[in-house]
């Protein structure tokens, strides 16, 4: 054991809790959407994609981590490490880029930078395809030699190799690519789109002399923006910051928990996403009931 058995027990219990909550909520999202025709709208296709991404993380990542935590190390070998790392990365990236597509959709529909544009089913499918392509450009390279997946932290889950400059894997270039394309860019897009969305609501409220309806709309959008931004940062910023520090300070001494804690903070969107995008949607709530 790299740390005390109690830490592995706590990790296993945490993963069990994520599975216990994340699987039924995301599965329910899929079921309700497929069951109720009125929910099959272009916007909800993106929400459905989030649920699929979260299920990838739950079934492909969380279950494996819970199992390996019972043994105190990653017992599934190189193939198991590649599969766990791939599915966990794929699910997280699909969710991340789905949030970007959703932010762009909200900006275009509400702020109308393109006059007479209507978000259609074809646009939604293009957005979904984009999210999958971007996710695969992050999750596949470590399987084919551009970087690699290795056990990290407490050695119960696998992630991209930020830790070494292993010869032949070009870890440095892949990590730099990840930290340019797969973190600041999506974060900047989300901030820009929701910032413009909030400004548009404020302008509409001012033009209508702060009517009760527009005040309520401004409040709802403000709350959604705050939740989105905080949720994104809380989940991803600790992991990205620690991973970048490790990459820049390879060879430095740090304990296994140093990387374990932020990596499992980043797994919480499997619970956050349905809460933010589904439970705050009245139509979804009514259909679930």
From Swiss-Prot:
Which cysteines pair up through disulfides? They are: 81-158
So which domain of life are we looking at? Answer: Eukaryota
Organism of origin? Batrachocottus multiradiatus (Baikal sculpin)
Give site residues, Plays an important role in the conformation switch to the active conformation. 84
State the name under which the record lists this protein. Rhodopsin
Q: Which gene encodes it?
A: rho
A single Gene Ontology CC term: plasma membrane
Concerning InterPro entries, the annotation shows:
GPCR_opsins, GPCR_Rhodpsn, GPCR_Rhodpsn_7TM, Opsin, Retinal_BS, Rhodopsin
Q: Does the keyword Ribosomal protein apply?
A: no
What post-translational modification does the entry describe? Phosphorylated on some or all of the serine and threonine residues present in the C-terminal region.
Hey, which stretches end up on the Cytoplasmic side? 33-44, 105-123, 196-223, 280-289
